[in-house]
Amino acid sequence: AAFRNRHHYATTGARIFMDVNAQIDKEMHQIGDIIQTTSDNVTLNVEVIGTAPLERIDLFDGKNIIETIRPWNLPRQIERVRITCAGQHYRGRGRLVKWDVGARLDAGQIKQYGTVNFWNPNKQPKFSSETEILWETVTTGGASAVDLWVDGFSGADTLFVDTNQGNMKIAANKIDETGVTQECGGMDIRLTVQQLPRQLTQKQVAISRDLKLINGIERRLFVRVTQEDGHQAWTSPFYILQS
């Protein structure tokens, strides 16, 4: 019954805890509920406990992100850059995208690297110099990322990312937490460069958001959580119609 009524959430495998409810006036609703109301507002209550530090929490209305919560702040100096390869050619067989990637700084130094969704021990990144690193990976609709911990990279210094799917050239002062994305065709094949703090520590977040309801327009509210290690979780939507 709970499954048929959408009172559940899904994860990519990690046992992420999510407790999400919608409060309209004094009544509480579970994820997946179909709600008709005369109220003008809904309060969305979200609690998340991750199995790894949290990178972001996205609040959706249908396909649209209405807010992104990042439980961390960036330092004044760039310390860590994440380069993400993602997407697929199309649904079904043959969707696999092969990536051949090189990342290079024109100033500063790459001190160390980390990986997300690199499961093949024979396909790990390799340094070619203290300013350049090379790797190969594949995606089939999901994402694969390499984190670079950098030193002395700032201002107009430039990061070059060259791949067989698309290339990027971006100044250090243009790399922020939201990221810069290069679309590469297919079904959401993309290359993204973003900045992260040196270390993420926050695994638990509790927030509440008051959202407006508009007469005759259905809101389809759900929450997506993304951890630093790439694992994600999604709730079923609330379907809320003011009438």
Label the model's feature ranges.
Residues 1-243:
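C-terminal functional module detector
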